[in-house]
Amino acid sequence: MSPTREDLVATAKLFIAKYNEFTPESIISVRTPNSVSHRLFPTRNATRNIGESMEACANAKEVFKSLTVSVIDDNDTIVDERTRKVVFYLASRGDTIVGEWKSECIFIFQMSEDGKLVDRIWAGFDTAYMDEFESRLDGITF
């Protein structure tokens, strides 16, 4: 039986909950072993496998003291049951070594055939905010 809308949304929300734990292990705990994530930047496209995602999280922890993402409005959630995709419009908040982080992003999830794990992620970020944030990090050595 194909996963229902509710199944797909529940898996995407579980991913967000694990993402908010913000550890290399938690961010992959709801992903398939061969899953990939794609960052959607016009100038910074990146595709990461599980190991690369864990490394990116470990590196981000050097900058972020805390990070939380949350669905802005459940009414804006888009679900395509046929392709097993869920789209969330998210707010992200955090404390960093250079001050507050506050932005919005969009995550597109494609689930495994049973709907219980995330197989692919496309993450779109506010590039203007990212550029400004990265300029605050200029000159800082980790």
Swiss-Prot record:
Keywords: Isomerase
Annotated spans, Substrate: 37-39
EC number: 5.-.-.-
Effect of gene knockout: Impairs the synthesis of terretonin but accumulates terretonin C.
Positions with a binding annotation for substrate: Y19, R39, R48
Function: Isomerase; part of the gene cluster that mediates the biosynthesis of terretonin, a fungal meroterpenoid that acts as a mycotoxin. The first step of the pathway is the synthesis of 3,5-dimethylorsellinic acid (DMOA) by the polyketide synthase trt4. DMOA is then prenylated into farnesyl-DMOA by the polyprenyl transferase trt2. Methylation by the methyltransferase trt5 then leads to farnesyl-DMOA methyl ester which is further subject to epoxidation by the FAD-dependent monooxygenase trt8 to yield epoxyfarnesyl-DMOA methyl ester.
One GO term (biological process): terpenoid biosynthetic process
UniProt-listed InterPro entries: Fungal_Meroterpenoid_Isomerase
Listed pathway(s): Secondary metabolite biosynthesis; terpenoid biosynthesis
Subunit structure: Homodimer.
Protein family according to the UniProt entry: Belongs to the trt14 isomerase family.
Name of this protein: Isomerase trt14
Effect recorded for Y19A: Leads to a dramatic decrease of the catalytic activity
Effect after changing R39A: Leads to a dramatic decrease of the catalytic activity
GO molecular function, one term: isomerase activity
Lineage per the UniProt record: Eukaryota, Fungi, Dikarya, Ascomycota, Pezizomycotina
Disulfide pattern: none
Catalytic EC class: isomerase
Coiled-coil stretches noted in the UniProt entry, renumbered to this chain: none
